[in-house]
């Protein structure tokens, strides 16, 4: 088992390269037992305040392994509107509910939630279930 303790901003040539696909929720956890995409046993033991993003690299204390983080496809809702203003209103209402949200110019993506889906559909928005990578905004006060 490799214990990953820190971010690695630059690639290390002699380290073993692995990949780790995590859901949006898993990327927010500091402590996590998991397996790399290659099947290696991993333990995340990260400092406080780190939210992993796709493309981040993690390393163990000895720099024997470098693990690149990827967004794992997960159940999501894709929200589309007939006008930009309707999409903006949807983002406003979702923000009031503190719903983690991935924002694009022509659609919003959020974790699958039947109650929120019903609310959005009642507002006249088009909501589609998709299994897709989910990368919500990190928030205004995030320091990473």
Curated annotation (Swiss-Prot):
InterPro entries listed in its UniProt record: UreE, UreE_C_dom, UreE_N, UreE_N_sf
GO molecular function annotation: nickel cation binding; unfolded protein binding
Biological-process GO terms, alphabetical: protein folding; protein-containing complex assembly; urea metabolic process
Alphabetized SMART domains for the sequence: UreE_N
Localisation per UniProt entry: Cytoplasm
Main localization of the protein described in the UniProt heading: cytoplasm
UniProt keyword terms in alphabetical order: Chaperone, Cytoplasm, Nickel, Nickel insertion
One of the Pfam families matching this protein, by short name: UreE_N
GO CC annotations, alphabetized: cytoplasm
NCBIfam families: PRK13261.1-1 (NF009751)
Record-stated family: Belongs to the UreE family.
Entry function: Involved in urease metallocenter assembly. Binds nickel. Probably functions as a nickel donor during metallocenter assembly.
Protein name from the UniProt record: Urease accessory protein UreE
Organism in which the protein naturally occurs: Thermosynechococcus vestitus (strain NIES-2133 / IAM M-273 / BP-1)
Upper taxonomic lineage: Bacteria, Bacillati, Cyanobacteriota, Cyanophyceae, Acaryochloridales
The gene coding this protein: ureE
């Amino acid at each position: 088992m490799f214990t990953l303790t820190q971010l690695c901003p630059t690639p290390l040539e002699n380290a073993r390269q692995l990949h780790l696909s995590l859901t949006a929720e898993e990327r927010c956890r500091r402590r996590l037992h998991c397996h790399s995409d290659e099947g290696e046993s991993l333990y995340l033991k990260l400092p406080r305040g780190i939210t992993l993003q796709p493309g981040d690299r993690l390393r163990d204390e000895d720099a024997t392994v470098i693990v690149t983080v990827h967004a794992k496809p997960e159940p999501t809702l894709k929200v589309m509107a007939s006008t930009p203003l309707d999409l903006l209103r949807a983002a406003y209402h979702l923000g009031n509910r503190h719903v983690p949200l991935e924002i694009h110019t022509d659609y919003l993506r959020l974790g699958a939630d039947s109650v929120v889906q019903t609310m959005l559909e009642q507002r006249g928005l088009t909501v589609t279930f998709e299994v897709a990578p989910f990368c919500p905004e990190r928030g205004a006060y995030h320091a990473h």
